């Protein structure tokens, strides 16, 4: 009787070990790679919901766009989860204030003759491994800077205008690389003797590569502003001053890393219908240019 009981106990022990071994084997061999990862996209610092209620978001995996939709700002402020494939490269772009008709599949475009929209954007790229949760902080960045033209000492009733030309006409999408093409815009009248025009960032705000630096130097070199004054006798505009805007910006040590770029101010000193000088002020740094003789166009 004791012998039988010992045999039974031994059999139970063997069976239990077999079940445990089988269970352990299934745990060890379980493949969790098909399970997706999740990326928590969060606006850092938080976005003011009074300024933006919703933003467009584009998600890319291994260079291929996976999804594009809009998301409420309050969700981005508290953390917005996006499914991502494991062992892939994840990219997310936020965008607001850009006309839909100016958006191509892989870049944002400013049609020639238009100023830059009051757009904002953010970008984040990261490798997704085998973990299940990742964190992507996104800082909303302004995609433009403002150029202001002011005139002093002008004759009553005279008119003037400013145009800005460059070779950056938008941004790569996703990401923050520059898109190169002809940019031409005329400053709009804000008030009497004051004109303003928005120009696109001339330097990307994230992940600047060596190739970008070379192109950025060329882009800044090409950025210029031209000022015209109306000749009342002829009834046409006379070109009075060419401003090497890009060179002045470059020499000033302008901080392109700021989320919101500082505006560039051009002050004209006038005498009757002639420009005596122009003072360009950038973040407290000034350059004074003498007025040209004037060429009627």
Language-model features, listed with the residues they occupy:
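Sec-dependent bacterial lipoprotein signal peptides
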Residues: 1-24
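Bacterial Sec-dependent N-terminal signal peptides
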Residues: 18-46, 288
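Conserved "repeat-terminator" motif of extracellular CCP/Sushi domains
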Residues: 33-34, 136-144
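Extended amphipathic alpha-helical interaction segments
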Residues: 141-161, 166
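Structured interaction patches on ligand/partner-binding surfaces of diverse proteins
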Residues: 97-135, 233-273
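Tryptophan-paired
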Residues: 53-104, 159-251
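Eukaryotic extended interaction platforms
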Residues: 257, 264-297
């Amino acid at each position: 009787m004791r012998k039988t009981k010992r045999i039974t106990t031994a059999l139970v022990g063997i069976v239990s070990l077999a079940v445990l071994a089988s269970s352990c084997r299934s745990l060890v061999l379980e493949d969790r790679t098909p399970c997706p990862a999740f990326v928590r996209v969060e606006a850092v610092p938080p976005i003011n919901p009074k300024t933006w209620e919703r933003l467009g978001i584009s998600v890319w995996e291994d260079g291929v766009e996976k999804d594009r939709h809009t998301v409420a700002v309050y969700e981005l402020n508290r953390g917005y989860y996006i499914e991502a494939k494991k062992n892939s490269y994840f990219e997310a772009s936020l965008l607001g204030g850009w006309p839909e008709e100016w958006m191509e599949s892989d870049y944002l475009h400013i049609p020639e003759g238009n100023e830059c929209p009051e757009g904002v954007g953010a970008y984040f790229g990261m490798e997704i491994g085998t973990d299940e949760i990742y964190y992507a902080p996104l800082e909303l960045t302004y995609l433009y800077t403002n150029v202001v033209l002011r005139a002093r000492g002008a004759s009553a009733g005279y008119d003037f205008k400013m145009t800005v030309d460059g070779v950056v006409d938008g941004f790569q999408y996703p990401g923050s690389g520059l898109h190169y093409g002809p940019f031409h815009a005329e400053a709009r009248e804000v008030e009497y003797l004051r004109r303003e025009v928005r120009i696109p960032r001339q330097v990307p705000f994230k992940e600047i590569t060596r190739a970008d630096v070379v192109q950025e130097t060329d882009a800044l070199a090409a950025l210029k502003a031209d000022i015209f004054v109306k000749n009342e006798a002829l009834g046409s505009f006379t070109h009075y001053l060419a401003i090497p805007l890009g060179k002045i910006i470059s020499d000033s040590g302008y901080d392109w890393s700021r989320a919101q770029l500082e505006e560039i101010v051009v002050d004209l000193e006038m005498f009757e219908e002639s420009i005596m000088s122009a003072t360009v002020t950038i973040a407290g740094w000034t350059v004074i240019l003498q007025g040209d003789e004037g060429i009627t166009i």
